[in-house]
Amino acid sequence: MPKHSKRYLEAKKLVDRTKYYDLDEAVELVKKTATAKFDETIELHIQTGIDYRKPDQHIRGTIVLPHGTGKEVKVLVFARGEKAKEAQEAGADYVGAEDLVEKIEKEGFLDFDVAIATPDMMRVIGRLGKILGPRGLMPSPKSGTVTNEVAEAVKEFKKGRIEVRTDKTGNIHIPVGKKSFDNEKIKENVISAIKQIMQMKPAGVKGQFIKKAVLASTMGPGIKLNLQSILNE
């Protein structure tokens, strides 16, 4: 088992592991347990009831948080001509075509958080699947990152649109703010995220879709949420 720091163990004492916290109390507590010397990210971890062995139950999509994540998002766009110009004007950090593909392949360039591509670029960037796929960076129509509306996509991801996907255990992990955020902003982000994820329930999932939700800071312990109180908001 990994050894936890003294700071983590002290923070853990503040959390009742048997309790499901209402959101107001959970947000207060997650900030209290975020004791690192940097502005910790507040994360939402969701356990779903999907069967990961069934590909039609995998979840991949995007949601928009009303107050963003507090993180500066670096956006890369694969596009040519007019679409490349639109992406640049919308604020994309990197725009290119074959030149960017080569930079990623040969130099291992990965200094970006989101990659967007116009549909005509997919045959060019297909060979990047092995590099970008495992990192969750490969453009995909499901996540809204393969589109001709590049300017709109760039602006949305810069503003706070984030990708949601289930890992191999059927869990979802997303940032919902920073410790420095007002409590109300974190709370509104959490409510919005859970309600949007509820809309992504695959048709084949039987029984309860969201089984458990936990709030935690980067270096802090998990705080279980009372889901019913959130869904009633």
Swiss-Prot record:
One of its GO terms (biological process) is translation. SUPFAM superfamilies: Ribosomal protein L1 (SSF56808). Pfam families: Ribosomal_L1. PROSITE patterns: RIBOSOMAL_L1 (PS01199). It comes from the Bacteria. GO terms for molecular function: rRNA binding; structural constituent of ribosome; tRNA binding. One of its GO terms (cellular component) is large ribosomal subunit. Keywords: Repressor, Ribonucleoprotein, Ribosomal protein, RNA-binding, rRNA-binding, Translation regulation, tRNA-binding. Gene3D superfamilies: 3.30.190.20, 3.40.50.790. PANTHER family: 54S RIBOSOMAL PROTEIN L1, MITOCHONDRIAL, LARGE RIBOSOMAL SUBUNIT PROTEIN UL1M. Part of the 50S ribosomal subunit. Binds directly to 23S rRNA. The L1 stalk is quite mobile in the ribosome, and is involved in E site tRNA release. Belongs to the universal ribosomal protein uL1 family. HAMAP family: Ribosomal_uL1_B. This is Large ribosomal subunit protein uL1. It comes from Thermotoga neapolitana (strain ATCC 49049 / DSM 4359 / NBRC 107923 / NS-E).
